[in-house]
Amino acid sequence: MSNQEYTFQTEINQLLDLMIHSLYSNKEIFLRELISNASDALDKLNYLMLTDEKLKGLNTTPSIHLSFDSQKKTLTIKDNGIGMDKSDLIEHLGTIAKSGTKSFLSALSGDKKKDSALIGQFGVGFYSAFMVASKIVVQTKKVTSHQAYAWVSDGKGKFEISECVKEEQGTEITLFLKEEDSHFASRWEIDSVVKKYSEHIPFPIFLTYTDTKFEGEGDNKKEVKEEKCDQINQASALWKMNKSELKEKDYKDFYQSFAHDNSEPLSYIHNKVEGSLEYTTLFYIPSKAPFDLFRVDYKSGVKLYVKRVFITDDDKELLPSYLRFVKGVIDSEDLPLNVSREILQQNKILANIRSASVKKILSEIERLSKDNKNYHKFYEPFGKVLKEGLYGDFENKEKLLELLRFYSKDKGEWISLKEYKENLKENQKSIYYLLGENLDLLKASPLLEKYAQKGYDVLLLSDEIDAFVMPGVNEYDKTPFRDASHSESLKELGLAEIHDEVKDQFKDLIKAFEENLKDEIKGVELSGHLTSAVALIGDEPNAMMANWMRQMGQSVPESKKTLELNPNHAILQKLLKCEDKEQLSAFIWLLYDGAKLLEKGALKDAKSFNERLNSVLLKAL
């Protein structure tokens, strides 16, 4: 087979250009990424050797080998893992595939240090090698294939694939280093980077180098060169080590390698259980949200091992989805090694491990919540996703309610439900909340006026998930939740009803509102809960479903709502006497637009609003 030339996808070209010309902040991470990829390939081969009958007799000792040539300025990373065939090479090294390249590019901030830290998190680690290499040669042979292939590229838009000769399965990557990066072809540089980032990769990493010694004395002294191969990492599964053997730095370094994250974790939970079930867990709470936190196709951050043998890193059932930000390891002594992913979903052992793990993680979050400053670091990136647990995790609902924070209208800050309850007024029977799309608009809502008169605080909820989960939360500590916009809540305020004579008085004006706004609203009602506001847009029909659709990224058609009017307001009292139909129509539209501004903060037809406003002003002057 002759060499076949391919062109990188557009996004890969952008990425390569970025790697080569921009991300210079932390070049050494390329080695961490390539070693991590090699470790993943070994994990996958181990799993296949357990589950594929054809591979059960394969005689191989998983390892990673590094070598270099300082004269030729090359560095080679070799593993005997699962390997790749031609289609794998095209998919993984030439196209976006599952690499997350597009998301990576959209997440870039322009800060080189921050951007370089994103490389591994977005699964584009292989391409980081182009930060130091002018050319890369990949030779690989898939464990299930007889044919090996070579992939070659200088990172300038194209790559070549050809057949090659390779006896053992696995992948060998040779980097032809740039002149300014030739120091990476050095024993001490490689050793230092591996110890910094890959000390606890659970496979041995060997470094081949030439050791120079001198023998003899005086004129007989001569230089003797000897090729050596040393293991340069511990190759220990850190989670299986005793806590007493580990320091904070060990946990931090393992996290950065495991999670492809240069930042330090907020916290970690290392737990070993012995008894009827035996398992070890090591979970990390990151300090920043992963890029795919709110994507349906998010990648699980937890790996499952059985007796230190990797099983899967793609099972979203290991932890509930509202804890998808957690990174870490579950290692069971009781699950069968050949367990399938289908069996995992119904396995009682794993269900027990999951249940206990959730409680451990929530307890750690509770510990963080004792310190407001630290808790803010957790809650800002992860508070929204934690709320999702209210919808599905009934077992831990009370604990989750304790951990959530809500914006208090009275205090002007985020508070716990416990704090809210401590400040309940003497006759207050409920916890009131108001839903909306924007916190600033909620603060200005006319609905809050009557609650303020009573001295009742209202929690302002502006996350899209709120309208989806809150209707399913009935109470906290025996105190019911009430939507402040609902009629039941307004009745609790003891508002005066609108008398029949007032309704008769406004009958014609309401009809005028309905005729002018027939394409915009569902109807018009007089309201007893408005004080200073003239008008208010009422509830959205099927608000729960609409917000669920927004959460899923679906477009939600504009639905018609009720317009509520304040019969006691001076403007409406004046409109009762307005006989100029054209002017009345302009006033009606201005009042409706004002109510829409309070609801949405914007108008879909600002031009017409401006024309009506100018017309009214002209007549008033």
Curated annotation (Swiss-Prot):
HAMAP family assigned to the protein according to its UniProt record, in alphabetical order: HSP90
Localization per Swiss-Prot or TrEMBL: Cytoplasm
Function: Molecular chaperone. Has ATPase activity.
Domain of life: Bacteria
Organism, as annotated: Helicobacter pylori (strain J99 / ATCC 700824) (Campylobacter pylori J99)
Signal peptide per UniProt: none
Region annotation (A) ranges: 1-341
Region (B) residue spans: 342-547
Alphabetic keyword roster: ATP-binding, Chaperone, Cytoplasm, Nucleotide-binding, Stress response
Region (C): 548-621
Family: Belongs to the heat shock protein 90 family.
Any single GO CC term annotated in Swiss-Prot or TrEMBL for this entry: cytoplasm
Subunit structure of this chain's protein: Homodimer.
Gene3D superfamilies: 3.30.230.80, 3.40.50.11260, Heat shock protein 90, C-terminal domain, Histidine kinase-like ATPase, C-terminal domain
GO MF term (any one): unfolded protein binding
UniProt protein name: Chaperone protein HtpG
NCBIfam families membership: PRK05218.1 (NF003555)
